[in-house]
Amino acid sequence: MSSTDQGTNPADTDDLTPTTLSLAGDFPKATEEQWEREVEKVLNRGRPPEKQLTFAECLKRLTVHTVDGIDIVPMYRPKDAPKKLGYPGVAPFTRGTTVRNGDMDAWDVRALHEDPDEKFTRKAILEGLERGVTSLLLRVDPDAIAPEHLDEVLSDVLLEMTKVEVFSRYDQGAAAEALVSVYERSDKPAKDLALNLGLDPIAFAALQGTEPDLTVLGDWVRRLAKFSPDSRAVTIDANIYHNAGAGDVAELAWALATGAEYVRALVEQGFTATEAFDTINFRVTATHDQFLTIARLRALREAWARIGEVFGVDEDKRGARQNAITSWRDVTREDPYVNILRGSIATFSASVGGAESITTLPFTQALGLPEDDFPLRIARNTGIVLAEEVNIGRVNDPAGGSYYVESLTRSLADAAWKEFQEVEKLGGMSKAVMTEHVTKVLDACNAERAKRLANRKQPITAVSEFPMIGARSIETKPFPAAPARKGLAWHRDSEVFEQLMDRSTSVSERPKVFLACLGTRRDFGGREGFSSPVWHIAGIDTPQVEGGTTAEIVEAFKKSGAQVADLCSSAKVYAQQGLEVAKALKAAGAKALYLSGAFKEFGDDAAEAEKLIDGRLFMGMDVVDTLSSTLDILGVAK
């Protein structure tokens, strides 16, 4: 059939050449000044003329700050990004240490195992490897896998196909010795076997409250020489500091400072700086904040490459290899299935950030050890889905070129470099750990984070926001008792709220706060919807009455069995009925009375209401203080 028969005139083919389509081409180009004026209009709407904000003041109000002082502005522009983006796989490695070639296995799905039951762990390891796991992370400790059981738990593993990494919180030497011994007994050629010993004597000392001993590093590196060049003796574990409360800047800076000190130590022990770089890996944290995680991984590679340049390391050896592990500090005990979402975001962030291996913690990590394969399956499948279905692994540095991510990478790198230099002035990371420097930085971060958690500027879904009393949990095995440590204390972010919940569940009947909802649902619905979840954070039940006379409200209060009440309504109803109901509830025996709203909404009765009412519920309130004091009033033991 001819082209004419098919309906296409050969003379018209020139009209089919592709053209660039500009989606915004029909609109006038907006200047930055016009954008700024529009921002001013929005933020000044309703403000009196004498209180109008300038653009700089508007920007300040819209800017947020991380716990360690990184500014995040509402909009980034071309001038905020570097002029040259660079390329993945080449110095300074900001965009990736390696080049992803389109294969789906762009990173190792590295499964964590720490169950001391060697038979359970052996079976779990085999099931994981048969179902998508590509490498292993084993905790070898008195409360985890015993060194003498390592041979058994790895007995089904094809060591020539599976990299194994160990780490320990109590005896790194014993863990390393146990792993090397397993590999030395293998009948496979040593050069085909890759293993990571997970040594980090500085982080170990910080965790245990002891003095770092770097003198053994060289011996371990030499012992690994017979194995695959992919083997590593050192894993700088920034996760140790993250779990103790470090922000992104400190976690990054202290990893760099630790690495620099290890390079110096290994050079003194007879290695070149390039050989030292070859034996160092990083373990970094992936959190619920995807952009900070992506930027931190990128910034670490860039800064580590700069350190390599100073040490004279071969350019192609300066890339930082990173094992990202999802944040233990982010994991919650209440409503644990929400942790699957947190783990998904963190794993996504690590993959976009260019981690070579990713460990997704089981969503039960705050409850106990997995009782069966289900939590382990969800953890490994998170990475597999992202790699094989979402296809992130087919893309090199997908966040590269983003004005926001590029600017955030630069901000983190600059701030971390400044802290790195402070540590260097102290004499290195060993000195920083042994002095008060690390604890002072951690105390500042933890204090700021505690404020944000308490006022919910840093909300925790299903815990401090949208809590569900009696949410479905999952059966786990209890964690074995761990030996005491004298070093850095670890705390999950949700612990402060879980302590409140524990107080409520420790009594035979849940404590109650009566919601006195005045007027119609149109009047009280918004306040009731805000206040009820606040009380539920601590596991406090909220019986309520919807409208009615003062006498009916008091009668409902008495029947509820509550000893504390919370007024919920609109300004209009507060002005009409609020004071009367407040007085009646106090007369009926309310030990404490709260107001959802503002005292000024009582109109002429505002001053009297403020004297009568014990506290308020409002956006930005310290929910931890209010809930704790309410439980005190109700006589619930701490």
From Swiss-Prot:
Recorded metabolic or biological pathway in which this protein acts: Metabolic intermediate metabolism; propanoyl-CoA degradation; succinyl-CoA from propanoyl-CoA: step 3/3
UniProt entry keywords in alphabetical sequence: Cobalamin, Cobalt, Isomerase
Enzyme superclass (EC): isomerase
Polar residues bias: start-end ranges: 1-11
EC number, UniProt record: 5.4.99.2
Keyword Transport: no
Region (Disordered): 1-34
Native source species: Propionibacterium freudenreichii subsp. shermanii
Molecular function as annotated in GO: cobalamin binding; metal ion binding; methylmalonyl-CoA mutase activity
Swiss-Prot/TrEMBL cofactor(s): adenosylcob(III)alamin
This protein's name: Methylmalonyl-CoA mutase small subunit
